[in-house]
Amino acid sequence: MLKLARPFIPPLSRNNAISSGIVLTSRRFQSSFTFLSNQSLLSKNQMKSKRKKGSKKAAYHRQPPEHEHTAPLIKQNKTITKKEHSDVRGSHLKKKRSDFSWLPRVPSTSHLKQSDMTTNVLYSGYRPLFINPNDPKLKEDTGSTLYEFAMKLEDLNEPLSPWISSATGLEFFSEWENIPSELLKNLKPFHPPKEKSMNTNELIHVSAKRNTLVDNKTSETLQRKMDEFSKRRGKGRKKSVVTLLQMKKKLEG
């Protein structure tokens, strides 16, 4: 038999030995103090803070002798100027006060919005409140002035006919929508013809003509009645002459 140089160690026992060796050799080191528990660091920090405070106090108390003499005078002048300023301000406010009690009081308009007001003005038919001067189209030198531009806007705003909308331009009537614009432009309001003043000769002629027409009508009616009586002669007790006379009197009256 051959002799082994090293004794045979099974794998399980080998792993156990390695792990035990690691446990024995590995140690966890932790610091036993912090900044607050270290007295040397705290004392150094306190010394630094004391030096800073001392330097600030020295700079605050270090003033030249001239400044020391003039300091109270400056303060006094400052107080005087403040008082004078307050007096002047108070007198100014007193002068500005005025009595507005005689003016009529109106309800607040805080509930109205600017956007709603501008839209109402835009859709109500009025001219715009302002023209933007920064518009590049207006800045161009076209030879026309702002007045001419406003007149053109006014011409565009005018309706085709006066009866297509109300007098204020707030309401448009729908019955005129289907009528063409060319016909609307040619429409004119109706004016009754003037009565002609007649002369005396013309009046006499008209009255005579009217009388002749009346006489012709009466003669025609009498003739018609006489023809009727002549046809039914001998019928009835009333005489035809009496009825004709009565009829003539009634027509003439």
Swiss-Prot record:
Residues 1-36 form a transit peptide. GO terms for biological process: aerobic respiration. Transmembrane segments: none annotated. Residues 81-90 have a biased composition (Basic and acidic residues). GO terms for cellular component: mitochondrion. Keywords: Mitochondrion, Transit peptide. It is found in: Mitochondrion. The keyword Mitochondrion applies. Residues 47-60 have a biased composition (Basic residues). Residues 44-93 are annotated as: Disordered. Required for respiratory growth, stability of the mitochondrial genome and for proper assembly or maintenance of mitochondrial proteins. This is Protein PET20, mitochondrial. The gene is PET20.
